[in-house]
């Protein structure tokens, strides 16, 4: 049976992650408060950030930047701004 969480990003109850995907206290906070759907949305933004900003995950500063963006996106409701990206126009 799926584990439900009260997702702070979606502001509703939704299926939670199957296991802790991120280390440490932040990982526990994500596991307890973020749904699979919200995590999937973050992964899309994360991929775009890494590619567009040419982040190197071996670089501590780049990892710290990405972690702060993740916190802003998942817990503070801030949208990730990616230079040059224009979302598709819906008809």
Swiss-Prot record:
Keywords: Iron. This is Probable Fe(2+)-trafficking protein. Belongs to the Fe(2+)-trafficking protein family. Transmembrane segments: none annotated. It comes from Shewanella denitrificans (strain OS217 / ATCC BAA-1090 / DSM 15013). One of its GO terms (cellular component) is cytosol. Could be a mediator in iron transactions between iron acquisition and iron-requiring processes, such as synthesis and/or repair of Fe-S clusters in biosynthetic enzymes. InterPro entries: Fe_traffick_prot_YggX, Fe_traffick_prot_YggX_sf. GO terms for molecular function: iron ion binding. GO terms for biological process: cellular response to oxidative stress.
């Amino acid at each position: 049976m799926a584990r439900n969480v009260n997702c702070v990003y979606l502001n509703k109850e939704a299926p939670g992650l199957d296991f802790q995907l991120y280390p440490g206290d932040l990982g526990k906070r994500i596991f307890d408060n973020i749904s699979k759907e919200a995590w999937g949305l973050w992964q899309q933004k994360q991929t775009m950030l890494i590619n567009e900003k040419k982040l190197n995950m071996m670089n501590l500063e780049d990892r710290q930047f990405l972690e702060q963006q993740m916190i802003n996106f998942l817990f503070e409701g801030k949208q990730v701004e990616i230079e040059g990206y224009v979302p598709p126009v819906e008809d």
